[in-house]
Each structure stands twice: as C-alpha cells, then as structure tokens.
Amino acid sequence: PMILLALGLLADTDIASLFTAITMDIGMCVTGLAAALITSSHLLRWVFYGISCAFFVAVLYVLLVQWPADAEAAGTSEIFGTLKILTVVLWLGYPILWALGSEGVALLSVGVTSWGYSGLDILAKYVFAFI
C-alpha cells in the first residue's frame, strides 16, 4: 500500500482514486495470503489466487490508465512513468512466481520460490525508494 500511496501522491490524484487503489491492493494481498495458506483444497487455493489476480488487474488499471493523466497534469509524468513501469514489471512477478512456485503447480522448489520473492521485494521496495 505504501508504494501506491507514494505513486498516488506523486501523481496528485484525487483521494477517492487513491483510496480505491489502496483498498484493491490490500484485497489483493489478503486474498493472495489466503491462497497461500489454504491447505484443505487445491481448488480453493486457485479460487483465492484468481480473486487476488482480479484485485491486481484493478490496481494495474489505476496505475496504467487513470494516474498517468493525473501525473501529466501535476507535471510529474517523467518520474511517475519510471516508477510506474518499475512497479508494474516487478509486481507482475509475484503472481507468476506464486503460480509456478510451491504454492501453485510446484514447478519451482521452495527455495527458488523463496529467493524469488525476496529478490522481488528488494527490487520493488529499495530500488523504488532509491529512485
């Protein structure tokens, strides 16, 4: 949520759009966590994964369609565009890693999945903060 807050404030978006994006992000995280923690039904895990991905699509819509116009009007489109692309590209890695990793179809080992999440976390948060 903090990355979206920073991007929304940078784009000088309205509070309703900011609240919607952060709410969708929290929904994505909570349903993604539920998908990872459910052990009773593999199908139910994928249902929660799908719901999480639907929340993610809503977040992507805000980042890629709504906020760029706000950033243009605010005069911050260059830095917003850089941070937006960094965020979108790295965040796309999380659902892919979940699906291929030990929580999903288990094509990747637990270690590779864990290192993948760690790498995405470091890049998504620290590189974002550095820029």
Swiss-Prot record:
Q: What is its main location?
A: membrane
For membrane topology, the record states:
Multi-pass membrane protein
Please state the span of the N-terminal signal peptide per the UniProt entry: none
Give the GO terms filed under biological process for this record.
Answer: phototransduction
The molecular function GO annotations come to:
monoatomic ion channel activity; photoreceptor activity
- InterPro entries in the cross-refs: Arc/bac/fun_rhodopsins, Rhodopsin_retinal_BS
According to its record, what are the GO cellular component terms? Answer: plasma membrane
Instruction: Outline which residue ranges sit on the Extracellular face.
Output: 39-41, 101-109
Per the record, the domain of life is Archaea
Question: Which key words are in the record?
Answer: Cell membrane, Chloride, Chromophore, Ion transport, Membrane, Photoreceptor protein, Receptor, Retinal protein, Sensory transduction, Transmembrane, Transmembrane helix, Transport
Q: Locate the transmembrane regions by residue number.
A: 1-11, 15-38, 42-64, 77-100, 110-131
Q: Give the subcellular location.
A: Cell membrane
Query: Which residue stretches are annotated as topological domain Cytoplasmic?
Result: 12-14, 65-76
- As stated in the Swiss-Prot or TrEMBL entry, residues carrying the post-translational modification N6-(retinylidene)lysine are 125
Sequence similarity: Belongs to the archaeal/bacterial/fungal opsin family.
- Record function comment: Light-driven chloride pump.
- What is this protein's name? Cruxhalorhodopsin-1
Q: What organism does this protein naturally occur in?
A: Haloarcula argentinensis
Q: Lineage of the source organism? A: Archaea, Methanobacteriati, Methanobacteriota, Stenosarchaea group, Halobacteria
